[in-house]
Amino acid sequence: MREKNYQYRPCLHGKKQRLKNRVLVTKVSATSDKQSMKRKNNIYEKIYSMENLILADAKARKGKADQYGIKVFDRDKEGNLLKLQQMLINKTYKTSPYSTFLIYEPKEREVFRLPYFPDRIAHHAIMNNLEKIFTDMFTTDTYSCIKHKGIHGAARSVKVALKDVEGTTYCLKLDIKKFYPNIDHAVLKSLLRRKFKDQDLLWLLDEIIDSTNGVPIGNYLSQFFANFYLTYFDHWIKEEKRVKHYFRYADDIVVFSDSKLYLHQLRSDIADYLIQHLKLTVKDNYQVFPVVARGVDFVGYVFFHTHTLLRKKIKQSFARMLANRRNDASINSYYGWAKHCNSKHLLKKLLHDKTV
């Protein structure tokens, strides 16, 4: 399926011209982003260079040196890297079988895991060369799994937006139904071919994409595939719909406006775009509400115009973590979360009373 997309031409003059500019006139809106105009080639040989594979191994093992798979790999590190290089050169690389497990925070999800060798090294070898290409395409309004952005980057941007009190009277909050499992392989491959023309690279990406249904949560590559899958949608929101206050973290979307009617119409437009172009559906539990009434629950915080609180479930998990004296890394993570909101009294209570 070839995704249709459009470019919004800026208004020049007069009512007639404004009406004309509302017509969908040119294919591929994301090509207005200069980073998306040029298709990339000659990448594959950089992926299998020994220098890149050594770097990929170093990145993939960071903080995980005690894992059994890494210890096995290290028994013949040089030989194993040469094997991986030959798999890539000869195009005999095939994704290994996945193991799966469940996580329950922040919600129950099935997580997929691949062996350290050859898969996790191969994924890092790919992203050493593709990460900047992908991130250069992303709009400034997406935050998940992007260096120097993430949860706290999203929180900072929402706080800045809410300083425009009149322009953020109402909030549209929605997310996509089973986003990762429902990513369509044919659509994802089509989008990748709009960006890359290196046929060997596309073979490798196709092999990984087709290794399971949807895009598996837990793969290093998956977070980039997911953001890339929605990046043309992000550009449509910003460049054609001209939405000022828009924020996306993975499949969680928040939009602010001074008009409830506008947000309801935008939700309908978003649902139409996602189903027509990306074969995705918006969950039925979307919300349009006044910010002052209950705040905006997003990326672990509840945002108001005047202050920011920690989400109730995060607060409860933090309290349990402290009460049970679980690992320090997790406690530090929750503490870092709490520091970025109005939590002085909460922290004082938790750190002294160990209860909420």
Where in this protein do the model-derived segments appear?
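Short, conserved non-catalytic motifs in the polymerase core
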Residues: 63-71, 96-121, 137-149, 207-227
